[in-house]
């Protein structure tokens, strides 16, 4: 009897029509329905005499039909980013060279890996939406490599009974069921490198080749990056499979790559670095056209098909982020969203480019174009420091006729310039940098773009005036924007060689940009101040007075000193050896993806404009503890307080002999 009742369809067919077939079977055969069947046993047996099974078959067909309709509706509402995600290399919107570079690394570190080889690490960087993670997954799938991806754990939801059990005074003491993210991350790396991935339902990939993918690091690593460095060092020793980190570039000034993976760690752990570029407009245009064609053929009149001009504006406004472009395309193609494309009729980007090449481009059209891009893309356009400096230093201009704008009178003709294609204030704002820091980079690189010494003098005057405006800490917050505007516009206006659109300014060849030497000089200055205060504490003078007034005279006096650290410091500060050749310091090149960050050893941002705190830089007069005499301290322990960058102590006799040799050499030369 029980076997018959197990296969009898329930009486509530209408309720079960909206449920899955597997769910119906499970509930009809489940244990939870046994009591219900025992209570309603006779009525169920009576109903089994009638042809209920045929009615059940009809309801099952209706359920299958409803499930198919629901799947179709779900596919229509599915995000196009997930619906059209690439499955092969040909579908990737990434440059072929980058794909080959990643594929070569995977073959060398996974497919051709030695048995006892340590853990290899790859760092992939690039802007958001350029296909970093997708490229790894697609290439791994094609080469039969398993991907074990780290996902930050979510804290479990506590129920009311859990809190009662934890804080129950009668029971024994209970700890919170919490484990730090760093501990969970270390355990994940250990398990992932030792054990293979579990074979889930529908997973046909069975191979021992695998990689570990980390895209979302625990937040604790951003506060304490040294913990991550220790994890990397240990993984290089004990790791059995490659480890890949994916970090997106940030244009807001937060350089996670420099914080988490400094150059020292990359060299120590032999970390490979592959940098992705934003998706090219041509590749993005081809990808969006394919999506529009498929959706138009599938949905017919359910979507609004954008024209070619709208797609061009969308590609230009998304700043190389294909994920943002696909989302904007899906949102704008929905029915009733025809007003998302505010543009001129008959205006295309290609026609606009033709106008600019033929020198017929006007300022109102340029302003309208910028408004179009901002309205369509839905994403703020930002600039890296390298490109922002290039726009200021190369200062491209648009040629204007007499009808476009009035000319200056003859006595002011030397100040006449063509109209700029960029707004300097907007360029600095899009670089997401403080204005005084941008002035430092501008001051370091502006000379190489000038051809006349008079223009350099005029530009240096503008930079000096800008530094004066931002030098006073009391008015710095109010005058910082004016200071940046004067510096950028002054440098642009002073360069007469680039004052007109037809001028090349010494050629349009590429010129490398460099980081400011101010950071290195100011770091050396701070170390000298701290060393002077540590080595000569009995002289109640600020560090600046010690180095400019006292120590140069002590170097000329014959006062016996037994402290080698003091002797070395006085010789380094108070004397300038004649054989030391002073020249330009070694400059560090500025890369195209680097942010303008303050040197970690140079202090706070307030030090950029020379506003040094009295306690750290100049040093307040420190009163020594009951000084009896003004003699130099003879303690040999002061040498340990000397910074590492200071020269090693050497005897004064050797320095005198060196000076004598130099004098003899010069006398022979004369």
Curated annotation (Swiss-Prot):
Pfam families: Rad17 (PF03215)
Coarse class of the protein's main subcellular location: nucleus
Assembly mode: Part of a DNA-binding complex containing RFC2, RFC3, RFC4 and RFC5. Interacts with RAD1 and RAD9 within the 9-1-1 (RAD1-RAD9-HUS1) complex. Interacts with RAD9B, POLE, SNU13 and MCM7. DNA damage promotes interaction with ATR or ATM and disrupts interaction with the 9-1-1 (RAD1-RAD9-HUS1) complex. Interacts (when phosphorylated) with NBN; promoting recruitment of the MRN complex to DNA damage sites.
Gene Ontology cellular-component annotations: nucleus; Rad17 RFC-like complex; site of double-strand break
Motif annotated as RAD1-binding motif, chain positions: 6-14
Modified residues (Phosphoserine): 60, 75, 348, 635, 645
Biased composition (Polar residues): 620-651
PANTHER family: CELL CYCLE CHECKPOINT PROTEIN RAD17 (PTHR12172:SF0)
Subcellular location: Nucleus; Chromosome
Binding positions (ATP): 126-133
General function of this protein: Essential for sustained cell growth, maintenance of chromosomal stability, and ATR-dependent checkpoint activation upon DNA damage. Has a weak ATPase activity required for binding to chromatin. Participates in the recruitment of the 9-1-1 (RAD1-RAD9-HUS1) complex and RHNO1 onto chromatin, and in CHEK1 activation. Involved in homologous recombination by mediating recruitment of the MRN complex to DNA damage sites. May also serve as a sensor of DNA replication progression.
Domain of life: Eukaryota
MF annotations from Gene Ontology: ATP binding; chromatin binding; chromatin-protein adaptor activity; DNA clamp loader activity
Post-translational modification: Phosphorylated. Phosphorylation on Ser-635 and Ser-645 is cell cycle-regulated, enhanced by genotoxic stress, and required for activation of checkpoint signaling. Phosphorylation is mediated by ATR upon UV or replication arrest, whereas it may be mediated both by ATR and ATM upon ionizing radiation. Phosphorylation on both sites is required for interaction with RAD1 but dispensable for interaction with RFC3 or RFC4. Phosphorylation at Thr-622 by ATM in response to DNA damage promotes interaction with NBN and recruitment of the MRN complex to DNA damage sites.
Protein name: Cell cycle checkpoint protein RAD17
UniProt-annotated stretches for the region Interaction with MCM7: 421-670
SUPFAM superfamilies for this protein: P-loop containing nucleoside triphosphate hydrolases
Modification sites for Phosphothreonine: 44, 622
Chain intervals for the UniProt region annotation (Disordered): 31-50, 593-670
Family: Belongs to the rad17/RAD24 family.
Disulphide bonds in the chain: none
Entry keyword annotation includes Cell cycle: yes
């Amino acid at each position: 009897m029980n076997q018959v009742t197990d296969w009898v369809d329930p009486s509530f067919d209408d309720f079960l029509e909206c449920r899955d077939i597997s769910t119906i079977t499970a509930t009809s055969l489940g244990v939870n329905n046994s009591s219900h069947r025992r209570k309603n046993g006779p009525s169920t047996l009576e109903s089994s005499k009638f042809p209920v099974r045929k009615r059940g078959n009809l309801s099952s067909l209706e359920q299958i039909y409803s499930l198919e309709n629901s799947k179709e509706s779900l596919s229509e509402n599915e995000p196009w980013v997930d619906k059209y995600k690439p499955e092969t290399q040909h579908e990737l919107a990434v440059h072929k060279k980058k794909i080959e570079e990643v594929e070569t690394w995977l073959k060398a570190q996974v497919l051709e890996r030695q048995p006892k080889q340590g853990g290899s690490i790859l760092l992939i960087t690039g802007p958001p939406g350029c296909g970093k993670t997708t490229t790894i997954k697609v290439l791994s799938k094609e080469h039969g490599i398993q991907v074990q991806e780290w996902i930050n754990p979510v804290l479990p939801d506590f129920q009311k009974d859990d809190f009662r059990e934890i804080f129950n005074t009668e029971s024994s003491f209970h700890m919170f069921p919490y484990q730090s993210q760093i501990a969970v991350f270390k355990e994940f790396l250990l398990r992932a490198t030792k054990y293979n991935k579990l074979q889930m339902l529908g997973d046909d990939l069975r191979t021992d080749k695998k990689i570990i993918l980390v895209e979302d690091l625990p937040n604790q690593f951003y506060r304490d990056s040294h913990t991550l460095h220790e994890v990397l060092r240990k993984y290089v020793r004990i790791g059995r499979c490659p480890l890949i980190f994916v970090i997106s570039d940030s244009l807001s000034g937060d350089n996670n790559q420099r914080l988490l993976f400094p150059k020292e760690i990359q060299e120590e752990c032999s970390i490979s670095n592959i940098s992705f570029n934003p998706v090219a407009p041509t590749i993005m245009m081809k990808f969006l056209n394919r999506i529009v064609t498929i959706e138009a053929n599938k949905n017919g009149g359910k979507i609004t098909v954008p024209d070619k001009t709208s797609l061009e504006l969308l590609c230009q406004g998304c700043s190389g982020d294909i994920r943002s472009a696909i989302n904007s395309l899906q949102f704008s193609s929905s029915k009733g969203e025809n007003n998302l494309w505010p543009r001129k009729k008959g205006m295309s980007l290609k026609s606009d480019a033709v106008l600019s090449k033929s020198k017929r481009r006007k300022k109102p059209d340029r302003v309208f174009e910028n408004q179009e891009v901002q309205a369509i893309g839905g994403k703020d356009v930002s600039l890296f420091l390298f490109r922002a400096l290039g726009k200021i230093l190369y200062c491209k201009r648009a040629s204007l006729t007499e009808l476009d704008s009035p000319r200056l009178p003859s006595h002011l003709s030397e100040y006449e310039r063509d109209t700029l294609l960029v707004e300097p204030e907007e360029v600095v704002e899009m670089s997401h940098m403080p204005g005084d820091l941008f002035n430092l980079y501008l001051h370091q690189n502006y000379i190489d773009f000038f051809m006349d010494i008079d223009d350099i003098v005029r530009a240096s005057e503008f930079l000096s005036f800008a530094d004066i405006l931002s030098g006073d800490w009391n008015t710095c917050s109010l005058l910082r924007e004016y200071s940046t505007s004067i510096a950028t516009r002054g440098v642009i206006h002073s360069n007469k060689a680039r004052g007109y659109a037809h001028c090349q300014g010494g050629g349009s060849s590429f010129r490398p940009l460099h980081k400011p030497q101010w950071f290195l000089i100011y770091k050396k200055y701070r170390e000298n101040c701290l060393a002077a205060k540590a080595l000569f504490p009995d002289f109640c003078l600020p560090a600046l007075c010690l180095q400019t007034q006292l120590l140069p005279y002590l170097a000329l006096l014959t006062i016996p000193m037994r402290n080698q650290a003091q002797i070395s410091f006085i010789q380094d500060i108070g004397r300038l050896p004649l054989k030391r050749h002073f020249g330009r310091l070694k400059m560090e090149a500025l890369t195209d993806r680097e942010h303008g960050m303050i040197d970690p050893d140079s202090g706070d941002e307030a030090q950029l404009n020379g506003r040094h705190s009295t306690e750290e830089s100049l040093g307040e007069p420190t009163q020594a503890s009951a000084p009896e005499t003004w003699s130099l301290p003879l303690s040999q322990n002061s040498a340990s307080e000397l910074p590492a960058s200071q020269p090693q102590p050497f005897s004064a006799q050797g320095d005198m002999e060196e000076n004598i040799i130099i004098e003899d050499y010069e006398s022979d030369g004369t």
